[in-house]
UniProtKB/Swiss-Prot annotation:
Family the UniProt entry places it in: Belongs to the AIR synthase family.
Catalytic activity: 2-formamido-N(1)-(5-O-phospho-beta-D-ribosyl)acetamidine + ATP = 5-amino-1-(5-phospho-beta-D-ribosyl)imidazole + ADP + phosphate + H(+)
GO cellular component: cytosol
Coiled coil: none
This protein's name: Phosphoribosylformylglycinamidine cyclo-ligase
Natural source organism: Pseudomonas entomophila (strain L48)
Signal peptide annotation: none
Length: 352
């Protein structure tokens, strides 16, 4: 008999019992998000989902994303309750821009050492995000990988599938000169630009724990969960049929995201003076001495979603969005793009 001690998975840094405890704690979270099309519960090898009734030519739409280095801020602040909503928002907001209704969501949670309380808090936030989006949390993967991550540090990824009627896909092809652009406000930086944000905080020596802006802690402003626009936008599409294009304003800001949904000959003219930029963006710009153009290329600057409709549908669209609890405004219009011109032109940029 060998004198070497008998090694277990736990000795290697993987606690199977902790993983099982987490699954038990999150079953209720998944149950609260259940849609009637989902077949079976958590724990199977694969999640089954029917196509919802009523679709003639259903097209499945998929997307995957993470939350970038906002996660590092969450870890530093030990604030894990809203990062799950961020994860869901980054995926479902991308799906809805083509008119898709999110059906189901899966998450991937990887860590060096599984902290069941932290993981359960994160997944509870994912569940809350799924409820806001009307999609079902059908499964996920929790990977405890000692040696890959420092201690209880973790990384997140999300994956979502939605469905849209083939004839109703929104792809920007109907956008024409004279169309109007409507904006929906963001809650803050959402889940993009956090490497720049963290660099600004570091270089400026900002004490994030003891800084307030307009009476609100800076930490809360930076960790505000990404808004989920799915339900108001699906209502807008359903009630008006007027949406020609939508852009989720993520990494790349207005400058890089609006062109993704425009025809090649179209230019979006955006009036930067049409909204009051949230104070957190002005604070970051000042502390980091960030160029105005760079601000709009990295951060959303207060705009989370841009919607294109015909000029004669503007009031109708604004009314529907307001009835859904949104605070929309007209942010610009569509012009013809001159040869070689950028597809987004920002008017009334402030001097910096």
């Amino acid at each position: 008999m060998s004198k070497q001690p008998s090694l277990s998975y736990k000795d290697a840094g993987v606690d199977i019992d902790a993983g099982e405890a987490l699954v038990e704690r999150i079953k209720g979270v998944a149950k609260r998000t259940a849609r009637p099309e989902v077949m079976g519960g958590l724990g199977g090898f694969g999640a089954l989902c029917e196509i919802p009734a009523g679709y003639k030519q259903p097209v499945l739409v998929s997307g995957t994303d993470g939350v970038g280095t906002k996660l590092r801020l969450a870890l530093n602040l030990n604030k894990h309750d809203s990062i799950g909503q961020d994860l869901v928002a980054m995926c479902v907001n991308d799906l809805v821009v083509c008119g898709a209704e999110p059906l189901f969501f899966l998450d991937y949670y990887a860590t060096g050492k599984l902290n069941v309380d932290v993981a359960a808090t994160v997944v509870t936030g994912i569940g809350a995000g799924c409820e806001l989006a009307g999609c079902s949390l059908v499964g996920g993967e929790t990977a405890e990988m000692p040696g890959m991550y420092e201690g209880e540090d973790y990384d997140l990824a999300g994956f979502c599938v939605g469905v849209v009627e083939k004839a109703d896909i929104i792809d920007g092809s109907k956008v024409v000169t004279g169309d109007a652009l409507i904006a929906l406000p963001s809650s803050g930086p959402h889940s993009n630009g956090y490497s720049l944000i963290r660099k600004i905080l570091e270089v400026s020596g900002t004490d994030i724990d003891n800084t307030q802006l307009d009476g609100k802690p800076l930490a809360d402003l930076l960790m505000a969960p990404t808004r989920i626009y799915v339900k108001p936008l699906l209502q807008l599409i359903k009630q008006t049929g007027a949406v020609k294009a939508m852009a989720h304003i993520t990494g790349g800001g207005l400058l890089d995201n609006i062109p993704r949904v425009l025809p090649k000959n179209a230019q979006a003219v955006v009036d930067v003076a049409s909204w009051q930029r949230p104070v957190v963006f002005d604070f970051l710009q000042e502390k980091g001495n960030v160029d105005e153009h760079e601000m709009h290329r990295v951060l959303n600057c207060g705009v989370g979603m841009v919607i294109c409709v015909a000029q004669d549908q503007v009031e109708n669209a604004l009314n529907v969005l307001r009835a859904e609890g949104e605070q929309p405004w007209v942010i610009g219009r569509i012009d013809v793009a001159a040869e070689g011109a950028a597809q987004v032109e920002l008017h009334n940029l402030k001097a910096h």
